[in-house]
Curated annotation (Swiss-Prot):
GO terms for cellular component: chloroplast thylakoid membrane; photosystem I. It holds the Pfam family PSI_PsaJ. This is Photosystem I reaction center subunit IX. It is a single-pass membrane protein. May help in the organization of the PsaE and PsaF subunits. GO terms for biological process: photosynthesis. Keywords: Chloroplast, Membrane, Photosynthesis, Photosystem I, Plastid, Thylakoid, Transmembrane, Transmembrane helix. InterPro entries: PSI_PsaJ (IPR002615), PSI_PsaJ_sf (IPR036062). Belongs to the PsaJ family. The chain crosses the membrane at residues 7-27. It comes from Adiantum capillus-veneris. It is found in: Plastid, Chloroplast thylakoid membrane.
């Protein structure tokens, strides 16, 4: 179990999980608020 924790805490694994979550969040925001870059909020 110790080796699994060490593996999951390495930079490539953490970066992959982080960028995957960030991409999913941006996709969901873009789904509910499309064209947010073209029409700025008042």
């Amino acid at each position: 179990m110790q080796h699994v924790k060490i593996y999951l805490s390495t930079a490539p694994v953490v970066a992959t999980i982080w960028f995957g979550l960030l991409a999913g969040l941006l996709i969901e925001i873009n789904r509910f608020f499309p064209d947010a870059l073209l029409f700025p909020f008042p």
